[in-house]
């Protein structure tokens, strides 16, 4: 579920819709948490879908570390990509605000964290040499995302957390240890799931 202080807005014909903050969301706030309304789909099931449904599942879902497709039930499926994302993933089925998000600002993810099935060509952005999201970006950029997440967790206990009740019980003690600085975060490199595209590339070489 997305943070309640967000809304869906139309951007333009090229991008489509995006998710925007309606109020100030401070750094360290849970901006998304996986909950029991999200669909968890087996890749074999997705592969057997008709082409129309399969196309939409692959467009609006992401893959977890177990290769399962996570299809969010709410506006979370419309979060767009940025190489300077203001949301950062964790190993705990939630994302945090990587920095303060201002009212009217779009919430974004770096799609490199989402285990894409295929490379994803992006709109140009300043201050980055990246122009394409690759299925194995987690293997390249995990230290950067770990650092951002660790810094965000330092603010976790100092901000309001409307989605706190959605944290999975299996993660509660670990998150408590992180926020109390007794534990280090688990690296998001463990979110990585090898894609069929990468397997095909390996066979080509």
Stretches with model-predicted labels:
Residues 50-81, 134-164:
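Active-site-adjacent segment of 2-oxoglutarate/Fe(II) JmjC oxygenases
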Residues 1-12, 51-124, 129:
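Catalytic core of the SET domain in histone-lysine N-methyltransferases
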Residues 20, 24, 45, 62, ...:
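Phenylalanine-focused residue identity feature
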Residues 1-45, 81-92, 191-205:
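Conserved AWS/pre-SET-to-SET junction and N-terminal core of the SET lysine methyltransferase domain
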Residues 18-20, 30, 69, 114, ...:
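Compositionally biased, intrinsically disordered low-complexity regions
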Residues 35, 41, 46-47, 95, ...:
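Generic preference for flexible, low-structure residues
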Residues 21, 33, 76, 85, ...:
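A sequence-composition feature that detects small, non-aromatic residues
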Residues 1-4, 13, 114, 118-205:
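Non-catalytic accessory regions of eukaryotic chromatin regulators
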